[in-house]
Curated annotation (Swiss-Prot):
Keywords of this entry: Cleavage on pair of basic residues, Disulfide bond, Hydroxylation, Nematocyst, Neurotoxin, Repeat, Secreted, Signal, Toxin
Key word tRNA-binding present: no
UniProt function note: Neurotoxin that paralyzes freshwater crabs at high concentration.
Record propeptide residues: 19-33, 61-67, 95-101, 129-135, 163-174
Modified residue annotations for Hydroxyproline: P39, P73, P107, P141
The protein's name: U-stichotoxin-Hau2a
Secretion signal, residue range per the UniProt entry: 1-18
Disulfide topology: C40-C51, C43-C58, C74-C85, C77-C92, C108-C119, C111-C126, C142-C153, C145-C160
């Protein structure tokens, strides 16, 4: 609204609502003319002291055409057709396959390290081998007069059988 119109409207409202200090009965007032202040605009017609909107008096509104843009804009594989996006496979980039994780199945054991999808033996990763102690057996086993002590045979005379003594000075050829 224009500032002049607002001022005039406020002024007229104040005049209508103002109470005169003199009694209304004492003063003869002339009737106010049937004119709307300010005058009615384009789409309005004066009816009594008011303006009434009459649509047939209004000029046609000019509508701004909406731009033919899809909101949000179309993505990689899509092309705008009117206000919509249509999928066009030829516009799609080649799909990137996710590489399979580099995990050996089954997972590598103690002495092995994964290289790519395979397990490679790494001796430094191997735990020290526990050697089984050799049994405490002398090789060859101890004979008649001997007893095993650790890995050796020790002669024990008490284990020896009594020797048969051959007669002395016997002629062997007779």
């Amino acid at each position: 609204m224009k500032p002049i119109f607002i001022v005039a409207l406020l002024f007229s409202t104040c005049l209508v609502n103002a109470k005169p200090s003199i009694n209304d009965a004492d003063i003869k007032r002339e009737p106010e003319p049937n004119v709307a202040v300010p005058p009615c605009g384009d789409c309005y017609q004066q009816v009594g002291n008011t303006c009434v909107r009459v649509p047939s008096l209004c000029p046609a509104r000019k509508r701004e055409p909406e731009p033919n843009v899809a909101v949000p804009p179309c993505g990689d594989c899509y092309q705008q057709v009117g206000n919509t996006c249509v999928r066009v496979p030829s516009l799609c980039p080649a799909r990137k396959r996710e590489p399979e994780p580099n995990v050996a199945v089954p997972p590598c054991g103690d002495c092995y390290q994964q290289v790519g999808n395979t397990c490679v033996r790494v001796p430094s990763l191997c735990p020290a081998r526990k050697r089984e102690p050799e049994p405490n057996v002398a090789v060859p086993p101890c004979g008649d007069c001997y007893q095993q002590v650790g890995n050796t045979c020790v002669r024990v005379p008490s284990l020896c059988p009594a020797r048969k003594r051959e007669p002395e000075n016997q002629d062997l050829w007779s």
